[in-house]
Amino acid sequence: MGSEDHGAQNPSCKIMTFRPTMEEFKDFNKYVAYIESQGAHRAGLAKIIPPKEWKPRQTYDDIDDVVIPAPIQQVVTGQSGLFTQYNIQKKAMTVGEYRRLANSEKYCTPRHQDFDDLERKYWKNLTFVSPIYGADISGSLYDDDVAQWNIGSLRTILDMVERECGTIIEGVNTPYLYFGMWKTTFAWHTEDMDLYSINYLHFGEPKSWYAIPPEHGKRLERLAIGFFPGSSQGCDAFLRHKMTLISPIILKKYGIPFSRITQEAGEFMITFPYGYHAGFNHGFNCAESTNFATLRWIDYGKVATQCTCRKDMVKISMDVFVRILQPERYELWKQGKDLTVLDHTRPTALTSPELSSWSASRASLKAKLLRRSHRKRSQPKKPKPEDPKFPGEGTAGAALLEEAGGSVKEEAGPEVDPEEEEEEPQPLPHGREAEGAEEDGRGKLRPTKAKSERKKKSFGLLPPQLPPPPAHFPSEEALWLPSPLEPPVLGPGPAAMEESPLPAPLNVVPPEVPSEELEAKPRPIIPMLYVVPRPGKAAFNQEHVSCQQAFEHFAQKGPTWKEPVSPMELTGPEDGAASSGAGRMETKARAGEGQAPSTFSKLKMEIKKSRRHPLGRPPTRSPLSVVKQEASSDEEASPFSGEEDVSDPDALRPLLSLQWKNRAASFQAERKFNAAAARTEPYCAICTLFYPYCQALQTEKEAPIASLGKGCPATLPSKSRQKTRPLIPEMCFTSGGENTEPLPANSYIGDDGTSPLIACGKCCLQVHASCYGIRPELVNEGWTCSRCAAHAWTAECCLCNLRGGALQMTTDRRWIHVICAIAVPEARFLNVIERHPVDISAIPEQRWKLKCVYCRKRMKKVSGACIQCSYEHCSTSFHVTCAHAAGVLMEPDDWPYVVSITCLKHKSGGHAVQLLRAVSLGQVVITKNRNGLYYRCRVIGAASQTCYEVNFDDGSYSDNLYPESITSRDCVQLGPPSEGELVELRWTDGNLYKAKFISSVTSHIYQVEFEDGSQLTVKRGDIFTLEEELPKRVRSRLSLSTGAPQEPAFSGEEAKAAKRPRVGTPLATEDSGRSQDYVAFVESLLQVQGRPGAPF
């Protein structure tokens, strides 16, 4: 098949290149099975060079006016081959404007001798001149008559997600476009659900790829966790964020096999399951990609890791694949007993008896539906809303497709053939992006829906999947029926080249574009139009609705109320349209000359492909910078007054107060303190840096037998010789000072990630062997720490004002706390494995002069070296041990930073919601009026609603479910279920679904009245009581005048358009009037204490 046989399935795991003939090129699935039979999948990446006579598009001269709705500026931070990439969304631009920008002097490709020279310049200049990437644009550049390798219509088993579940995942089973320029990057990642991906470079400059064989993917993950501990602790699958860049030099240094390859225009790249890949663009170009699957992928999908820190990551329910294609393992899999062992060397099979049976049943079902539609076309009748659409048949588990909750009103009309309906879709409503007409097949042209009107899963509006709707029926010749794998005819073939993977998707939200403008384009790029299968949930917008409308959210029954979308979820000026249009029910129908409901309306659930959201902002200062300290703004209370009761000889807090340097040195006091610390989580005097004693004491008070959950036992006796998991990442010891390159990992940590706790026989200090740099097998009963071995009974740390704890010697023969050496950026362990000596000569004079906010009044003179809060340009300074005693939050950070420090001032700001005081009716508060200024006002109404968050089996979730919707438990009487409990609930379509309970949240909304009589409905987080300290942003906009806005921020029409219409249940839809119970409910909510408009 245009390739040489590379022997026993490519044992060297090199990237292979294939050149199929036109005949071989016709069957996509068959050719993928063939290249795997040659071992291409072992590299994680393969290149396919299509036949010269094949062209996906006749010309690219007509796309300059196409809009790139949300370009992403890629800001990269880091050094020494380890980088983090952040995204900043820019304004929309056309392809023509983007081309001119990419070719401008600032962004153009630098002069270079060859690709190797260009690669060196890429890694050398990665952090300079942030490029702009036009990524994740839903649509295709293929001509509609291209059948071979059409990225919009590959017809692989991934189509089961759409055909059986009715789920559309943009960029996963639909195509995405990517416009790149020099240095635009896709970071290390595997595909969502560890799927395959295909990438075609339509035109422009080449694209360089790096790939790691799937059998070595775990090694890359372990390396990334070591250098980015902050990210890994926040999310186990943090590489799915597509923010982590690791250079080939680092990969070579740590012995991780990888290959590289360059993709030229007109070439395909295919990535394989669990194949980590990364890369960059050489200049202006355009690529198109999507995901697909084979039979081999199913086992990968069952064990794929999921991002745990974001709700909108793609998750495909594997139920349909296992039930249909692995029926013999289905029951075991449902019970969690199907132990899958992945064999990365095994090639995929082209077909199976189960797949053939499913394909045949789809063809049979389609034929029956076509016959029925012809009969119905000759006898049109008006359908009843309550009648079922039709019974679905077939082995895939057919079900009745009903009207979704009766929430879409449709006019009567003749019924049509579903195929006609697919070919001649209904025109789009006014205001929606309409770029052309798209035929069935996803990659071909059909009417489009503005992305701003699509519902993102992160908004919480995706309901569970409907019973499988037999909705999407391809033509007879398009129905995929795989043929047996025939012996290939080998030609002069695949050269094992060096590189390759596929661009990482980014966050794109297209703006609304007038339909007239786009209709003038010969071949516009077209996003997809799909139908959401259930009523959308209305979001409350405090500034766009009246008080009466706001409280309707609580009065009406049904799980449809939702908290306002946070500003962080909205990524551009077009998001107002996103709020108003998201989650609506749409029906696509056409009947003869008029618009009418079709019995075979196509219902789809839509999900977005995982994109790289701005999970954080780039750091505002370098790791070694010192912020100039301000005079009085940093005042903090001392963590311990020094007057604590010391009657309890084993109490930790009073013992700590005895360790100040201004007290007389007492070795016995240090012994007592170390012994008490050894019985307190995390039981290691060094790990406590990231788990302070105040946190451990609070945990013991609330739950005496609670453990840290990191392998630490929960009992209180001595932990010496027990193995637990250290909390200090190895990178904290290897970075700092002049260390600009990562160093080898510590060999004193076991393969299971644990290390034994060891205790000093003299001072009772307890540490992990790995944290203190001691070879475990050398520890005996009489082991002593470095300080006791040197008989330095009066030793104290030169960087802080507290005694006790784990000490090591410095290069100038002084002593230093290990935790101080870790947290002070310029300190450096010369022998990383043994954790000593410590070089502190690089600490700048400015750091020695910083004053600790906790001990500067206690100590007569400034001593030691302080660290500072990591929040932007905060100048709050403290000694490491003072901050640790005060409970300042310190966490592992990502390279090249070591420790992330959050002072109490910024920590409380981040958790302000938990500290909000209760607000009562009649209370005078301060809140923002429509004109953007803050005024005093009186609370005249209050309402609260408890909502549950649940996860459904198909990967969708709801975070605004009413307790009454759960049928398996009386939540009103018994309260919420326990976390993780499986519950049964009734959804808005009237059907019962099973889901997993996640959490319960109670939301509060208040109606306030300003001095001029105007009223507003606000959330609790937007209210400030007179007793609270007002944030600076509020104080600067606080007005003592009347709260009347100078001019309305929104006209009546704008406010009406901004509020999403609530889609009620069938009963609510039929009765448009207000019941007496509802009126009484609202009146009770709006009871006013005091006369409205009375002076405050």
From Swiss-Prot:
Source domain of life is Eukaryota
Instruction: From the Swiss-Prot or TrEMBL record, state where the protein is found.
Output: Nucleus
Annotated zinc fingers (PHD-type), start-end: 731-789, 850-907
Describe the location of the JmjC domain by residue ranges: 146-309
Co-factor remark: Binds 1 Fe(2+) ion per subunit.
Which EC class, in a word? oxidoreductase
Which cofactor(s) are needed, names only?
Answer: Fe(2+)
Domain Tudor, which positions?
Answer: 917-974, 975-1031
Q: Mark the residues carrying the PTM N6-acetyllysine.
A: 602
Q: Where are the zinc fingers (C2HC pre-PHD-type)?
A: 794-827
Phosphothreonine found at:
1065
What is the stated purpose of this protein?
A: Histone demethylase that specifically demethylates 'Lys-9' of histone H3, thereby playing a role in histone code. Does not demethylate histone H3 'Lys-4', H3 'Lys-27', H3 'Lys-36' nor H4 'Lys-20'. Only able to demethylate trimethylated H3 'Lys-9', with a weaker activity than KDM4A, KDM4C and KDM4D. Demethylation of Lys residue generates formaldehyde and succinate. Plays a critical role in the development of the central nervous system (CNS).
Please give the name of this protein.
Answer: Lysine-specific demethylase 4B
Q: Which gene encodes it?
A: KDM4B
